[in-house]
Amino acid sequence: MNGLGGLNKSEHGVGIGLVQLQLPVTVTKADLAKQTQVIVDLVAKARRNQPGMDLVVFPEYALHGLSMDINPEIMCTLDGPEVAAFKQACRDNRIWGCFSIMELNPGGMPYNSGIVIDDQGELKLYYRKMHPWIPVEPWEPGDLGIPVIEGPRGAKLALIICHDGMFPEMARECAYKGAEIMIRTAGYTAPIRDAWRFTNQANAFCNLMVTANVCMCGSDGTFDSMGEGMICNFDGTIIAHGTSGRVNEIITAEVRPDLVREARLGWGVENNIYQFGHRGYVAVAGGAQDAPYTYMHDLVAGKYRLPWEDEIKVKDGTSCGFDKPMRRYGEPLKPAAE
């Protein structure tokens, strides 16, 4: 049930619109300004499309396209004109918005960042992509963790970006911190279509959490993005899915965070987000609350290592045209003169 794409708004529903944005080519500051206006105009379209829509979501790379250009002239900042325009668009149209920026980082490579702005034009969520799509993407690994906020109509909201969603731990972290709706924005192209679909559903089912997911759409003359806006209910079923590949189509649905809360409290069978930390509670009071997973202990200790680690062939971005990095995580990028 999705309220006929959100046309029939229920008392406790949250209306979501996923914009399957035409893949842009952004090379210059003028291109960036033009694409900013495209997005602003689509915020207004979303509001006209459905007066009851609470949140409009734009894909990863909505401003910058898929070139992986790290030119500082076209990188964004939180206090820059692009974010200011998005704030004004949300304020003017009385709607929450989720946007993508490639963020200037003087101490390293740019961050691939996502922001959520409320219907008053205030920045409410700021996230840096934790798992860049290596070896293809050059972005600095995110360092802010996963924030969870109170979003439209009181729903608990989290944001992850593209490749993040291929790691079950990312969706689990969102849910563990209370997220009832997890947004996943992406720039994925057609070869990832099947993996995109089943991870969106698994992230929902395994965590009793709504997932709202959208990719760029159309072609830039080199890459073909797929759209594939998907809203998955907390039981893993798909309640809205953009399969036409039509650019700038807005995929809509109503979701029910109140039913997420009800399921998390009331489900016995497959209440996996609870049962993960309470193994076998039928046999032992409260269940086993240990951490029997070797990889977790090793990761915390800085000793994460696969049995086949020494045989892995791709460990940097040279196969995709990037220089081999010489600094470690947390070390600042040295100026070229040094």
Language-model segment annotations:
Residues 1-54, 183:
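N-terminal active-site segment of His-dependent metallophosphoesterases
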Residues 15, 98, 113, 145, ...:
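Conserved beta-strand and immediately adjacent loop positions that scaffold enzyme active sites
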Residues 30-120, 124-126, 189-207:
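Cys-nucleophile CN-hydrolase/nitrilase-fold catalytic domain and related Cys-dependent amidase chemistry
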Residues 71, 115, 126-133, 230, ...:
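Short beta->alpha transition motifs characteristic of CBS
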